[in-house]
């Protein structure tokens, strides 16, 4: 019977892989060769990996960029530094870090040393893995895309999700006068209220748009964070306040939104697109967002909502739970 020698075994790791695009069932736990830190990189022993809706789209082959298979899933991880590549001197081996690491659904991954973020001693790996993608997204949606101002009102769709739960708190910290969040269940609406939203509205209600207008004093929200698409996006633009800004950072429904250029002109409104991957080409801005988030988290002014955790071999179940809208906050895989 063939068995791997100890040294050979040390070069092997477990990872969630896809060999084709499709439903959650195309993901499989496989044994592959452990990566090696190249120049400018660090090798990370993964303790937790965050799951984002973009992961589902990538798995389905519907993401903004082409899904190249075979591939290891995942994009953000928290863990400890196992080894340093050539030219890397800090942080030292053994440091607790969070990073953007392609192939994060695995026991090990590599990341550029310049992009890693130290984890405070009082933060768990699960919480750390929950904030990079969605935290930086929430921060940049408010600071860079819409430039939310103190005293303004904001509508946050999918407010009980990873981005939404952080955006509610950030908007309040930035001085928003009225924060309105939408969600699809009583449990999620309760979470939205607990995080500080002034109004929590069920998007399944036929008159949800009218409820938003009422909550904003009849004017409509000055800022809208939109990631659903289709009719939700269309109605959102209809109630956007004059001189308002609506940023689109997803299309979870898969449905096309249709906007009137005449309306945008008449009401001096703006519709803005946001894609984190493109912002990664501006590491100064990414670092600025990460630093701002860490300051809020370390001070206790913000908290990360880790709603559901699954083990690595439960990646299929985790993706299905997100697709079925059965989760709140951030979904994390533990390794």
Model-derived regions, located:
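NAD(P)H cofactor-binding loop motif with strongest signal on the N-terminal glycine-rich segment
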Residues: 158-159, 228, 251
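Glycine-rich beta-strand-centered segment in the early N-terminal region that forms part
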Residues: 33-50, 62-103
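Short, Lys/Arg-enriched N-terminal segments with co-localized hydrophobic residues
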Residues: 2-12
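Short amphipathic alpha-helix with an adjacent loop that forms part of the alpha/beta core around
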Residues: 208-218
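C-terminal capping/lid region of NAD(P)-dependent oxidoreductase domains
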Residues: 218, 299-308, 316-335
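NAD(P)H dinucleotide-binding glycine-rich loop of Rossmann-like/cofactor-binding domains
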Residues: 57, 68, 90, 96-160
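Glycine-rich phosphate-binding loop and adjacent beta-alpha segment
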Residues: 176, 187, 192, 231-302, ...
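Mid-domain Rossmann-like dinucleotide-binding core that forms the NAD(H)/NADP(H) cofactor-binding site
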Residues: 129-205
